[in-house]
Design a protein with these regions (language model features):
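Short, exposed beta-strand "edge-strand" segments with a Pro/Gly-rich flavor and a Y/T-containing core
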Residues: 13-19, 45-60, 90-94, 163
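Short, structured coil/loop segments at alpha-helix boundaries
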Residues: 20-21, 54, 193, 197-198
């Protein structure tokens, strides 16, 4: 399928793995491997429904009678595919363990999550006014669920190995979380050469 919009066709989502391919089982095996370490929870990132026209998806859409030229139908097919994937992940993860699926919409997959996470790296593209504006809105998305403010120790974004935020910036993030009734979660990255710092 050809896109009229070059940016749409070549942005990073163009390279996202297809969950109707062998990648699905690869992901499940990774989750099973992590589960052996008895973690506090599983966070599945970047689970965003995007159109895919690989041979696996084309075959499955043909089996379901989906017109591949109908963008809305193709998008719904991908949402349904991810719903199926999340159902399977939910079955793998121990019921008492935390599970969060990071996606554009909490409505699609909220039944699999025991809490809501609001992601914000103020020193990156979000800015310091993002969290205070979004926190009350997110609280209303899932009444009664735990709220988590997910920030990070890195300065310029996820994947930044060059430096850490100053203490004052991290304290500001944690204080913001507590002020709005969120539990703070400070993300870190495992350096390719070593493990996480404790």
């Amino acid at each position: 399928r050809l896109y009229d919009d070059v940016d749409k066709a070549t942005n990073h989502y163009f390279r996202m793995p297809c969950f109707n391919s062998g990648y699905r089982e690869y992901l499940f095996n990774e989750i099973r491997e992590v589960m052996e370490k008895e973690p506090d929870g599983i966070f599945v990132d970047c689970m965003i429904p995007k159109p895919c026209y690989c041979s696996n998806c084309l075959r499955k859409m043909a089996e379901k009678g989906i017109d591949v030229n109908d963008d809305a139908a193709v998008f719904k097919f991908q949402v349904d595919t991810l719903y199926e994937v999340f159902s399977q992940i939910h079955a793998i993860v121990t019921p008492k363990m935390r599970l969060y699926i990071n996606s554009y919409s909490n409505d699609w997959f909220s039944e699999f999550e025991g809490h809501i996470e609001l992601e914000c790296l103020p020193t990156y593209t979000w800015g310091y006014d993002f969290f205070p504006a979004q926190a009350p809105y997110y609280r209303n998305l899932a009444p009664g669920k735990e709220l988590v403010y997910m920030t990070g120790a890195m300065v310029t974004g996820w994947g930044d190995f060059s430096g850490y935020k100053p203490d004052a910036a991290l304290e500001c993030d944690v204080y913001d979380a507590m002020m709005y009734g969120y539990n703070p979660s400070v993300g870190d990255l495992m350096h390719p050469r070593d493990g996480l710092n404790r």
